[in-house]
Amino acid sequence: LQVLDLMVQKAKELGLGVVLITHDLGMVASYCDRVGIMRQGRLIELKKVDAFLTDGPSQPYSRELLDAARVRPTPMDAAEANDAKRKSEPPLLEVIDLVKTFRVESNQTVVRAVDGVSLSIRRGETLALVGESGSGKTTMGQCLVKLIPSDSGSIRFAGQNTLPMSDNEFRPLRRRIQMVFQEPYVALNPRWTVRDLVAEPLKLGEPMSRADQAARVLELLDLVGISRKSADSYPHELTAGEQKRVGIARALSVRPDFVIFDEPTTALDIRVRAQIVDLVRDLQAQMGLSALFITHDLNSVRSLAHYVAVMRHGKLIEHGETEKIFSNPADTYTRKLLDAELPIEVPGAGHHKVKHLELQQ
């Protein structure tokens, strides 16, 4: 929002017109005077924002977008993951005082991207890790799956400290800990078909015949809602939502116990975002997954996570049940982060709020 506030200020100072391209209708309500809806290369609707929100869209597709954006998520109930049986079990994942630093060569300074973070996740629990860009969320996730080495601390998975393990020692656990990456198009090999991409992780598991492997791939496509006709498609032939689903299918192919979802709803339009949220929630229920959701999408957090942890400058500043954090955050930064979610309502239209500029101060 700081960037948008600055954009509005400069546009006013210089007398500029601005075209804002976005999926976020809250952003449209707060910053725009008119809204245009595009579909399949065509401009299907153009209206003043206040009329669009008050009188409603004239096109069915536009109405679907607005309705999807206004749906209040069904909160996850922390009690589901907090029953006596689960509370008596040791955590599936326990992180203690984790530290990861990076050296900036240009000025020889050291950045503590993850700075003494401790958290735990039990079986069947889902934790959302939120915070602004650069807070250390993705670095944290990469440390958990050993994509990058940690400097110090402890990462215990199923009772084993994975931090000192070599790649070979960690390999047997890699099947049980999977990650869905933020940018699926970058993570997916462009020369492989969907069939090949989903089949590749199966090599980490028990040996399978070609027939069993082919059947498992189709089963996974069904599970994540991808048409079997797309099995021979390449990543560039898929929509962003379909690419996300392929990434999820790859992660689930080896039947993991724990999955890290890095920005699972980023860069998706409102309808597809809702579909991905529903898919992930259904998969959690069906498979009993433990999960870490790394996200900026606070609206989706309420549907996806039992608990929320807030990161800032590499540190964990607040942690608790999702509804308690949303209804009564204890930390000032958390309150500002929640306030930065833009409502889809008429009063914000065209008024160009600038109260969010203080977020990083």
Please report, for each region that a protein language model flagged, where it lies by residue.
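Short catalytic/signature loops enriched in Gly
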Residues: 49-96, 104-110, 322-361
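Conserved ABC ATPase signature
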Residues: 234-238, 242
